[in-house]
Amino acid sequence: MSKAVTYRSGLTAGDAESEQSGELHAGSIAVWRPTAERPIRVKRLPLIGVLGSGPVGRGVATLLARAGYKVTLGTRHPDSLVLLELPVSVTIGPFDEAAKADVVFLAVVHSASRGLVESLEERLAGKILVDADNEWARWHYAATGLSDSLTEGSWMASLLPHSSVVRAFSHIDWDLLVTRATDEPGVWAVGYASDDDHVDRLVETLIWDMGYVPVKIGSLAESAPIDPGGVLWPRILTPDAMRALLDTGEESN
């Protein structure tokens, strides 16, 4: 069942209206995507929070800040990050401050993720949580550490029953996250999964703005391909190659 996602200013995912023209109304922003038939109009850009100051968290914050979003990078020790090279529009603060945003990305060490999201469950209620964490088996880097029948996305959704969990950015090596989007924007795909179709367009807009092409691979229960051990993990692929792997297990030429 879809959850109602309401932002602090009163903007809901339903306010992302499709319009034929690019005419702007006061207080709205039209966003055009290369593969979209019509622009997406929203009342304002959502505020972004990132939980985790490691390479993935910093990469996500950097790409979204460059795209014009206001980003709060949350960390356990904010004062220790003052010298990091980040866009000036990125604010560094505690986890609780980052969790106040409209859309929150999770990019912490997996062993810390459960305690963190449970402590922020009330703050994250009614929001979109984009889970980029990975749990891999200690005995095998390329195998999930969760049970065979449980995906990372489904596990995270069970911890946050009042949030809309989206699984994304889990299959791209951290050292390529910023460079591929910067050097070749709109070329490489990000596979994502969700159970709430009404948040997909907003998530896809964020992925486009970060320099990637969104490819939905299914529901959270179907997100094993972007978990450790999955056919897409850890790989960076074009949209056609990603779809071919998902459909046939073979890359397109």
Q: What does each of the following model-derived ranges do?
A:
Residues Q20-L83:
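NAD(P)+-binding Rossmann beta1-loop-alpha1 motif at the extreme N-terminus of oxidoreductases
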Residues R44-L47, G126, V187:
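Phosphate-coordination loops involved in phosphoryl transfer and adenosine-cofactor binding
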Residues L51, V187-N253:
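Active-site-lining helix/loop region of Rossmann-like oxidoreductase modules
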Residues G59, L63, L159, L206:
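Rossmann-fold NAD(P)-dependent oxidoreductase module
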Residues S89-I92:
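Rossmann-fold cofactor-recognition segment
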Residues P94-I128, D133-W139:
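Rossmann-like NAD(P)-binding element
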Residues D133-D175, R180-A181:
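Rossmann-fold NAD(P)-binding glycine/threonine-rich loop
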